[in-house]
Amino acid sequence: MAHDTEALEETSVVKFKNQDFRFLRDRCLSRGQLFIDDTFPAEASSIGQKLLMGKRLPKLEWKRPQDLSFGPPHFILEGASRFDIQQGRAGDCWFLAALGSLTQNPQCLQKILMNQSFSYQYAGIFHFRFWQCGQWVEVVIDDRLPVVGNNFCFVHPRRGNQEFWPCLMEKAYAKLLGSYSQLHYGYLPDALVDLTGGVVTRINLHSSPSDLLMVVKTAVQTGSMVACATPKWLTEESEVMENGLVSQHAYTVTGAEKIQYRRGWEEIIRLWNPWGNTEWRGRWGDGSQEWWETHGSRKSQLYENKDDGEFWMSCRDFHENFSCLYICSQFPITMDPGVTPNESWRQMRFKNQVISGNTAGGDGRDIQYLFDVQEPMDGNNVIVAFTVMPQSLKTEEWPFPLQFQVFKVDSQFQKFQKRLPPAFFSQFRDAAQGIDYVTKRNFTKSFHLSPGTYVVVASAHGKEVEFLLRIFLKMPHKDRNPNSSFNLKALKGSLSENESPKSSFHRYMDQGLDIDASQLQSLLNQEYLTGPPGDTFSLDQCQSIMALMDLKVNGRLDREEFARLQSRLIHCQHVFQHIQRSQGVLRSSDLWEVIESTDFLSGVLLSKELLSLMTLRYSDSSGRLSFPSLVCFLIRLETMSKAFRNLSKDGKSIYLTEMEWMKLVMYS
């Protein structure tokens, strides 16, 4: 019986099938050969029977990109984007929708794609990384792709057959799972987890919260992966319906907004179809009456009438036509009323767990995991997430081999540290939750549990199963002020006598002496800022703050730079709380008073025209400013004013070369 795990270490990378990319590449380069992958051969077995039935096998060929491209092939051309992807014959929209979402987080995407090309050290070999049961697995492939004639069997390159990263990544994922057939009709959360190592929150759209728009918008802005699926229609196969949607199909959620329409406001959500075409034909779709009746800068910001698979639709239509929404992030997102996306969670992780094949029924209760719930809380406070190794499963196996129960442990049994005795599992004992069958490779279950000690008991149907178990425990917000919409805690007031701001800062340092933008985002949202969805610091805002405060121009903040930022955050909080019209809301008309009340802006000159432009830049469509937007505005105003004074010789004008100007405006 396990009671806890060690602190989460940096996950090592495992070589799939023991293939070392650098060794294989260097050997091919030294021999002047292009790599041929014998572990995933250019044969029908790599396609799989499910996709070969009735297909023209004699005409199937495997060709390298240089034999298919209309020009020099590229791995990535002008940046990786969801619009580079176009689904082929395999029903792998579940994987491609997840991949499309990942392209919106370039930092995470780069960890999977890595730096590769068709020019530097090209040897016909590529490698990609996927997350499998608590560890990253590196998959090596050759670049031979299945075609009939010169038509791609699976994912198509979009730009003149020149950009090949989606095709090669799809092949690597097919190799990981066994064949291209294993990509044919899968489970969307599996791909979300395999691409990130995150945990998936499933939202039933028929009973979703009223603030779904804000939840989705915040999730997209903070780099979480968001995707959704349509239900089955009349047939078992996916088909295009009259409204333009595809049944049994996965879509990427790429944005959510509120837009002024006629005399009111309309909530709209943006989706992308992995087919690369075939869009919604209803309200707010491309070319719809709603867009014709919408004018101004807001329309130009949001709307493009392109046949690229991306479209807007109203949230009401989204609820009616989609069955479920999935949000994948490093920690769970609960949908309880009043809960913010920056809830604090503690994770217990149990890797490489194996249930032997001879455990079943009552005898299967020898895999046990203890955890404690410390304090009472509203809403779901425990998340149990199982990830089963694909090799433990057979195609379309049912019943699924793994099941689990959660029991509360009485005080008289808490002395047992290694194993609860059979007497604990008497026929009169009720589980905190009935038997849960792990029906998918990635299965997540939420619980609302009272304080006490609990045990997760896993068992199998007489089969050996390898899995990862993660238990997420919600931590109390001891420093939250229940009477305020947000609370940026001044560090000096919350630290003990023996603790300094620098030691608090140490908790967020990545084994060095500074932090990057993503760590800054975590620090601001999880430690200092609590508020409604949408009022948290986005990654883009943190990158902007980072550039403004980064005196050394290295993309990170050191101790002194962070201390400088901290003092401004605390001052911004005081100004915001003093001037706000209502809790958590500042009107753009209050900006003059804000600037006059901000000490670190002393001496800054501002015209009414410039202030009007800043109002357009930093306020929302209803003229309100969130606290993060205000921070970005004030810090940028200070930085640019100081830059002018430092560069000006007469206090009236400055002279810059083109490169000096570009550096100033592009990285600040």
Swiss-Prot record:
One of its GO terms (cellular component) is cytoplasm. GO terms for molecular function: calcium ion binding; calcium-dependent cysteine-type endopeptidase activity. It comes from the Eukaryota. Residues 537-572, 635-668 form the EF-hand domain. One of its GO terms (biological process) is proteolysis. Pfam families: Calpain_III, CAPN13-like_C_EFh, Peptidase_C2. The active site is at C93, H249, N273. Keywords: Hydrolase, Protease, Repeat, Thiol protease. InterPro entries: Calpain_cysteine_protease, Calpain_domain_III, Calpain_III, Calpain_III_sf, CAPN3/13-like_C_EFh, EF-hand-dom_pair, EF_hand_dom, Papain-like_cys_pep_sf. Its EC number is 3.4.22.-. It is an enzyme of class 3 (hydrolase). Residues 34-331 form the Calpain catalytic domain. Belongs to the peptidase C2 family. Probable non-lysosomal thiol-protease. This is Calpain-13. The gene is Capn13.
